[in-house]
Amino acid sequence: MKIFFAILLILAVCSMAIWTVNGTPFEVRCATDADCSRKCPGNPPCRNGFCACT
């Protein structure tokens, strides 16, 4: 049972980390579209100096 809860906790932490990266509540600065392709999934465009991550 302890192993099950440990796995659940690891999955919860990983999913929160993935949500933070994909959802990016933080503004991601960029100079070109290539910068965004490295910082955000899905190759979003660079608009007004920030990546359009969704």
Curated annotation (Swiss-Prot):
Transmembrane keyword on record: no
Signal peptide residues on this chain, from the entry's feature table: 1-23
Function: Potential blocker of potassium channels.
UniProt PTM comment: Contains 3 disulfide bridges.
Subcellular location: Secreted
Tissue and organ distribution: Expressed by the venom gland.
Organism: Olivierus martensii (Manchurian scorpion)
GO molecular function: potassium channel regulator activity; toxin activity
Superkingdom classification of source: Eukaryota
GO terms under cellular component: extracellular region
Record-stated family: Belongs to the short scorpion toxin superfamily. Potassium channel inhibitor family. Alpha-KTx 14 subfamily.
Disulfide bond among keywords: yes
Domain notes: Has the structural arrangement of an alpha-helix connected to antiparallel beta-sheets by disulfide bonds (CS-alpha/beta).
Keywords, comma-separated and alphabetical: Disulfide bond, Ion channel impairing toxin, Neurotoxin, Potassium channel impairing toxin, Secreted, Signal, Toxin
Protein name per UniProt: Potassium channel toxin alpha-KTx 14.3
